[in-house]
Regions:
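Fe-S-dependent hydro-lyases/dehydratases of central metabolism
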Residues: 1-756
């Protein structure tokens, strides 16, 4: 059973749910108010400890440590350098788990890694060499701790099960911490995730996590809020089970997460040689939550998230019973969004069963020691077969892999036909094991967004991914690719004890925290480029709509693809050539044209006839304008852009290509909106986007004044090619004083330069 409460709840002694303060007082003997009880959540206490101001409604946070991987750290360090950073003021972990296998671009990936090593020496960072660990496994093992906060430039920065509130954000927010500034954010609501019962044999963390995603994503129940895991069911989940659920909270669009801690949490830290990192965390005797998700773990079934989102969930038995109908419905819904090649799922149902072509167990969600051992228990003595189906396994860290070799589980998997791979995040973001054209992959990874597995629809390629737990993937492998729920097999799960070998990191990881070498030289490869100059916001703004996307949600993978293009993230100009390339291939040319026009304007050259006709139409409609002194840029419209990755490049690539704004009905995540702001793009909100369309111009007079004065709403004007001018209201939503100035200055780097 999974139930969403319509209203807030009071939790008494961490176990009893009450609907009102009177009931809570009766059960607890404590009289309180909603406002006072809200201070009883674990989240409130951690946020208060990290808040640098006395205002708990408008937070100004500093974090205990930060972390980035090799497709984000170059841009962050470059931004911080340009903003005046001299050394890292807090521990900063730089991992190399994304561009560590692909040979795209020759030396450029390894050039980035060597840049990071040199930065760790110069500024005092922590450098984790290639394939030693994925980013989140390493931070769980070495950095998380009770009551701490960690900021990461990866959306799946989540260590709540270890008592750490972790937040994934775009690079600009990390750069702020590196120059001694704060993370400014209105205090989020807190939602109780109340667990009871115990999962059946064969049920794994992805079954629980996907069930939650399916229940809360579309209705926005936890959007930009904190998910606080409580209830008696928590004690029935091993720590790695909790970790693997926790990392998937990102897919609900929540802001962060936190769990109660217990003896199992304490043992985790003892095993990893850090007993001091443990802290007992629990809600106060009476705590108020703004909502509640009630989950009976006894009732969770083997679950699958069909293409193209982790929330598109069915039980495996439900899919099996209605295979032809569900496969066809998913296929047709996907093909409404996809441009180019089409998805084929109809052919995956034959001989009375659903058949898949590939299985992947990988990374921070799937590649935990417990998950891989469970897969080994299922596959021991069996065979994946010599047909189309393949199975690859990517452990989360080298210590986990070493223990899998030592206890024989890796041998069990290899003997069954699985391939043991490096500690690499590739299958999660399109840089590893892209299926063949037309194939259907099942993966214990974090996401199955359109083409995130690496296919290129513009080149006639289309493959598809569903998410499943490692146990059901192993069960499917044991049946040669025939979709199988792990609960349908009779398996004796051995649950072997884990032994952590810290010496593997001690031998290879460079820990320069507190040992900065200011005279050390940064090592630049030929692909590592500085950020280009960004113009400040002029008083008026003219933008051309260069992409108009009507999908319900637009992901960051669509805004800037991952996979092989990630190798160019150290080169802003080159990477920007891929902006929207899989979703709207013509966007790049349209936006580039507007960038060229703006550069000509800045140089004092005449504006092209098309733009002058726009100004003539505005003048005719009585709208004052000043063409010579008005910034000209591009923009996109999307109903709800920014679901998914924290990658700042989803915004920066638009900006480099000449974008000055986004228009949306709402923004999918706080982190994407923050990325737009930090790169100087005004995040407009519009209620009636039908007033403009692709190719129209939008003129926003006095935009600089409106932003700086924090006006709630102001006018914009849509100008069509025939000269029709339509006035419509726009707003920016809430902006902090710093955010308003960042937009006015043109980007975060300009803001810091202007304030040095």
């Amino acid at each position: 059973m999974l139930k969403l409460y319509d209203n807030g709840i009071y939790l008494v002694h961490g176990e009893t749910i009450c609907s009102c303060p009177e009931e809570a007082a009766q059960k607890s003997g404590i009289t309180t108010t909603k406002e006072e009880a809200a201070k009883g959540t674990m989240a409130y206490g951690i946020l208060k400890a990290h808040n640098q101001s006395n205002d708990m409604d408008q937070l100004r946070l500093k974090f205990d440590s930060m972390t980035s991987h090799d497709i984000t750290y170059v841009g962050i360090i470059q931004t911080a350098r340009a903003s005046g950073m001299k050394q890292f003021p807090l521990p900063y972990v730089l991992t190399n788990c994304h561009n560590s296998l692909c040979a795209v671009g020759g030396t450029i990936n390894e050039d980035d890694h060597k840049f990071a090593l040199s930065a760790a020496h110069k500024y005092g960072g922590i450098y984790v060499p290639t394939n030693m660990a994925n980013i989140h496994s390493y931070n769980r093992e070495t950095m998380a701790g009770g009551g701490r906060m960690i900021l990461g430039s990866d959306s799946h920065t989540r260590y709540g099960a270890l008592g750490t509130m972790a937040v994934g954000e775009g690079g600009g927010e990390l750069a702020k911490q590196l120059v001694g500034r704060t993370y400014d954010f209105a205090r989020p609501q807190v939602i109780a995730i109340y667990l009871t019962g115990k999962p059946r044999a064969g049920i794994g963390p992805h079954d629980v996590a996907l069930s939650i995603c399916g229940a809360v994503y579309k209705n926005g129940y936890v959007k930009n809020k904190v998910m606080e895991f409580v209830g008696p069911g928590v004690a029935n989940l091993p720590i790695e089970f909790r970790n693997a659920i926790d990392v998937m909270t990102t897919e609900t669009t929540c802001w962060s997460s936190i769990w109660v801690t217990d003896e199992q949490t304490q043992r985790y830290f003892m095993v990893h040689g850090r007993p001091e990192a443990y802290k007992k965390l629990a809600p106060a005797d009476v705590a108020y939550y703004d909502g509640c998700v009630y989950i009976d773990l006894d009732t969770v079934e083997s679950t699958i998230a069909m293409p193209m989102h982790p929330s598109n969930t069915y039980t495996i038995h439900e899919l099996q019973a209605n295979a032809a109908d569900i496969l066809h419905a998913v296929q047709e819904e996907a093909n409404k969004q996809i441009k180019g090649a089409k998805m084929d799922l109809d052919s995956k149902f034959h001989d009375g069963a659903v058949w898949v072509d590939q299985g992947e167990i990988a990374g921070c969600a799937g590649g935990t020691f417990d998950n891989i051992c469970a897969a080994a228990d299922i596959l021991r003595g069996k065979s994946c077969g010599n047909g189309v189906f393949t199975l690859s396994i990517y452990p989360g860290s080298m210590p986990a892999l070493a223990e899998l070799y030592k206890n024989g589980r890796a041998s069990d998997l290899v003997n069954a036909g699985a391939i043991m791979r490096e500690c690499f995040c590739g299958p999660c973001f399109g840089a590893g094991d892209c299926p063949a054209n037309g194939e259907f992959s099942v993966r214990h990874t974090t996401r199955n967004f359109p083409n995130r597995e690496g296919s290129k629809p513009g080149e006639g390629q289309m493959s598809s991914v569903a998410l499943m737990d490692a146990r059901s993937i192993a069960a499917t492998a044991a049946n040669g690719g025939k979709l199988t729920a792990a609960t349908d097999l009779d398996v004796e799960y051995t649950n072997p004890e884990y032994h952590y070998n810290a010496s593997l990191y001690e031998k290879r990881v460079y820990n320069g925290w507190g040992k900065a070498e200011p005279d050390a030289e940064l090592r630049f490869g030929p692909n590592i480029k500085d950020w280009p100059e960004m113009p400040a916001l002029t008083n008026d703004l003219l933008v051309k709509v260069c992409s108009y996307i009507t999908d319900p949600v637009t992901t960051t993978d669509e805004l800037i693809p991952s996979g092989e293009t990630s190798s160019y993230r150290s080169n802003p100009e080159r990477l920007s050539e891929f902006a929207l390339s899989r979703r709207d291939p013509q966007y790049m040319g349209r936006s580039k044209e507007m960038r060229a026009i703006e550069r000509d304007r800045e140089a004092g050259k005449a504006l092209p006839e098309e733009v002058m006709k726009v100004y003539e139409a505005l003048t005719k409609a009585g709208v004052a304008n000043d063409p010579a002194n008005t910034d000209i840029g591009s923009t996109i419209f999307a109903n709800m852009p920014g679901d998914g990755s924290a990658r700042e490049q989803a915004a920066s690539c638009q900006r480099v290509m000449g974008a000055s704004a986004n228009f949306a009905k709402q923004y999918a995540t706080k982190r994407y909106r923050s990325n737009c702001i930090n790169w100087g793009m005004t995040p407009f909100l519009v209620e009636n986007p039908e007033v403009f369309e692709l190719g129209d111009y939008i003129f926003v007079p006095s935009i600089r004044e409106a932003v700086l004065e924090n006006k709630a709403s102001f006018s914009a004007y849509a100008v069509k090619p025939d000269g029709t001018v339509t006035e419509f209201p726009v707003s920016t939503g809430a902006l902090t004083e710093a955010e308003r100035q960042i937009i006015a200055d043109g980007c975060l780097i300009n803001y810091y330069r202007n304030n040095q």
